[in-house]
Amino acid sequence: MARININNLTKQFEHVTALDDVTLELEAGQIVGLLGPNGSGKTTLIKLMNGLLTPTAGSILINDMEPGIETKKIVAYLPDRNALPEYMTTDQLISLYEDFFEDFNRAKAEAMINDLGIDPRLTLKKMSKGTKEKLQLCLVMARDAQVYLLDEPIGGVDPATRDYILRTIISNYNENAVVIISTHLIADIESVLDDVIFIREGKIVLHESAEMIREEKEESIDQLFREVFKC
């Protein structure tokens, strides 16, 4: 069962504080929305959890391990922009993931990609932005990971692609895992969320269950987000 413990986490870049004394505890079996405007610290937090950045202060533990080589075996990461080699075909990318990740399910990836009707001989360079986003998500969700870190998976794509991405996440994630989705597009995603984190200027301003927000505050997550982040 996945477990993430973040304690007093701070990240500074020269004189800019991207994250300021963040403390969170996240358990398996949840889809968590990491919600905030652009520049609020969402991507920095996800990169720290994935071991791509190191903290200035504080700590992150994933199943009692600091982010590194061992956690990469159980963490599936979708970056906020395409990170796959443009010259590779779909078949080559599937083989690449199969070589890198022991928990990668080739048959599952092929089934998802086949449903999209993508020619396996087509290189990434010749695909549309929406198709690239779908393909990259299929590769990530074909892993039987314990933690899924999805950075802006629905940003910059059309509504039909957003619907596909959300369906793919819901139908393919491991229920013993925790899924963290960062976005500022709240209305599109709130129906799938179990837990909600609001982040602003590197600080956590709210961490609550989606159900509690709807029941106690009697409003949608999108409505609350607009109130909290009103200019």
Predicted segments, located by residue:
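The feature captures the beta-strand-to-loop junction immediately N-terminal to the Walker
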Residues: 32-37
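Helix-to-loop junction immediately C-terminal to a conserved catalytic motif
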Residues: 50
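ABC-family P-loop ATPase nucleotide-binding domains
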Residues: 81-135
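Catalytic Walker B motif of ABC-type/P-loop ATPase nucleotide-binding domains
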Residues: 148-152, 157
